[in-house]
């Protein structure tokens, strides 16, 4: 792991401990620590993704946050900006790396504990830290950060 990825992992963990959900912790880390330009209005989109989309245990909120960061850096504002064929491979590749690293992208598979218990918070804290590290390495590798 690089110094940058370790820094991102620690910051994401601290954000989670301070009350951000998993998705918010990832996005807040990369917007504050890495300068990813996500404004407050866009940041609020993260709030519903915690607990695998509102505690549905579906798509991991940390994974959703990673897709938001990647899309902010590589995405488009208008269809004429660039074809989706340039963007989808980035998010698909990260999805595959996430699944390989953690065994699944589903919150229910990654987090077997009851929400808001000590075990849940400890498990998610560790996961958010590792996910932020994985994203940092990926962004560096793909040269997506300025």
Where are these regions (language model features)?
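Acidic-glycine-rich active-site phosphate/pyrophosphate-binding loop
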Residues: 1-3, 30-48, 101-109
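Phosphate-handling active-site elements
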Residues: 33-44, 72-90
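DPxDG-like acidic metal-binding loop motif
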Residues: 65-73
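Transmembrane alpha-helix interface/packing and boundary motifs in multi-pass membrane proteins
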Residues: 48-57
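Conserved phosphate/anionic-ligand binding catalytic regions in large, soluble enzymes, centered on
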Residues: 56-65
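C-terminal binding/interaction regions
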Residues: 86-146
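Polybasic, low-complexity association/targeting segments
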Residues: 1-18
